[in-house]
């Protein structure tokens, strides 16, 4: 049994003693040990587990960068209990049967699975492992994420909640498809109407990476010129945001904008939300903690997509969080090898890890900086993303008033993230 005494509940401020049965008090180390004992938790806060609707776990196809096991452990280490896996796996997560000999196909086929969605839904059974976080899946908007032909709902509808699958209700699926995206690029213009029709048919939402550009590696401006690297103009993001706002107005389909990074995009989103349009947006810790000037110190380690923007854009990002324009915070956790990241600006891949350190970074910038409260930060990292992902946000204080076994187990599932404040 694990007893945490004098722990603070995140939303009510109540100081409580929290008792967790040994069967539920699982530790994260590889030995799978159990935490037991009686601890004074004064100065700690118990909160709903964080949820991240934007992670890249590289499994299958690139497990030398990250596997489901290492990705889920990273999430758990950062206090996350729910994540949404993006579809840029290898092969891509479009629901089609993989072909023998294709990159990454062996992992799927050797597991006795037909496609990537099937592989990830059965990962724990196939690999005989218990992962420490829940995960849902995001399906490709286009076949192979190529932007050429829209993915076919017939290939993935069976993986949604509410659809019959092999004689059992799909609500029993541990890892359903809950969103559609071609993350890494925006949905191409010629496919957008069909993709939105697919989204509407499935009752999901579209996640948009708001960029279309063929050149450039960092933000266009004085830093890109100093580095001698082609720049990416800020309006590449705005063009997609503006386009999709009009489509949301026209169709009524919920569009969620990923990792928004520019002041002009936040302005457009702010105005659209004032109209009541069905749009939401996120930003990521690196856009509120860093700007393109940090490339001069960190080099390609700070290369990402969208790129780190100007100091003005960084402040606009913080302001958009403070005024409620930003609905939630997501990490865009995207691991690569050090060898890959140390290539030149034109060759190094985009991406940065973030699950382990997201709360600390956001707390330092936003709470210590006086922009928002810690309670609001937890809402942005837990309640709001859980709601987007289709999970019912759970009030920990309310759980503590139900029967002890239910309270302890469900509270642990949602909240074994003890936050120093």
Annotate each language-model stretch with its function.
Residues 226-254, 301, 328, 334-414:
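His/Asp/Glu-enriched, well-ordered alpha-helical/loop segment
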Residues 150-329:
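Histidine/acidic residue-rich metal-binding segments in metalloenzymes
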Residues 42-130:
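Metal-associated gating/positioning segment near the N- to mid-region
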Residues 63, 95-100, 114, 214-226, ...:
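Histidine/acidic-residue-rich catalytic or RNA/ligand-binding cores of hydrolases
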Residues 1-39:
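N-terminal metal-binding scaffold of metallo-dependent hydrolase/deaminase domains
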Residues 7, 43, 54, 75, ...:
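Divalent metal-coordination and catalytic microenvironments
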Residues 126-140:
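A glycine-rich helix N-cap at a beta->alpha junction
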Residues 419-421:
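Conserved small/polar residues in nucleotide/adenosyl-binding loops
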């Amino acid at each position: 049994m694990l007893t945490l005494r004098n722990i603070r509940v995140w939303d009510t401020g109540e100081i409580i003693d929290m008792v967790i049965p040994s069967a539920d008090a699982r530790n994260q180390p590889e030995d799978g040990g159990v935490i037991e004992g009686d601890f004074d938790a004064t100065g700690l806060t118990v909160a709903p587990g964080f949820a991240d609707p934007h992670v890249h776990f590289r499994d299958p196809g690139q497990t030398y960068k990250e596997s489901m096991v290492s990705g889920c452990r990273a999430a758990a280490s950062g206090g996350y209990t729910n994540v949404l896996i993006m579809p840029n796996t290898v092969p891509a997560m479009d629901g089609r049967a993989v072909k023998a000999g294709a990159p990454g196909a062996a992992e799927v086929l050797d597991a006795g699975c037909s496609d990537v969605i099937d592989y990830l839904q059965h990962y724990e059974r196939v690999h005989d492992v218990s992962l420490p976080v829940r995960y849902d899946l995001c399906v490709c908007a286009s076949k192979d994420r190529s932007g050429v032909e829209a993915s076919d709902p017939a290939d993935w509808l069976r993986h949604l909640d509410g659809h019959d699958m092999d004689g059992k209700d799909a609500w029993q699926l541990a890892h359903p498809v809950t969103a559609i995206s071609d993350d890494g690029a925006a949905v191409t213009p010629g496919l957008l109407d069909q993709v939105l029709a697919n989204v509407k048919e499935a009752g999901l939402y579209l996640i948009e990476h708001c960029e279309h550009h063929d050149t450039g590696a960092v933000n266009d401006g004085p830093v890109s010129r100093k580095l001698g690297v082609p720049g990416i103009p800020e309006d590449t993001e705005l063009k997609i945001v503006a386009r999709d706002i009009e489509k949301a107005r026209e169709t009524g389909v919920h569009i969620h904008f990923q990792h928004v990074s520019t002041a002009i995009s936040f302005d457009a989103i702010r105005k659209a939300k004032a109209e009541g349009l069905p749009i939401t947006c996120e930003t990521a810790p690196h856009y509120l903690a860093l700007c393109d000037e940090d490339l001069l110190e960190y080099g390609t380690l700070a290369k990402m997509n969208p790129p780190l923007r100007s100091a003005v854009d960084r402040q606009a990002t913080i302001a958009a969080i403070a005024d409620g324009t930003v609905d939630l915070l997501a990490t865009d956790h995207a691991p690569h090898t050090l060898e890959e990241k140390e290539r030149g600006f034109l060759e190094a891949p985009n991406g940065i890890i973030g699950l382990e350190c997201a709360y600390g970074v956001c707390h330092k910038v936003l709470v210590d900086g006086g922009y928002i409260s810690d309670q609001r930060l937890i809402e942005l990292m837990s309640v709001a993303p859980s709601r987007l992902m289709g999970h019912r946000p759970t009030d920990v204080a309310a759980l503590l008033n139900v029967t002890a076994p239910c309270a302890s187990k469900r509270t642990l599932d949602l909240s074994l993230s003890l936050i120093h404040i």
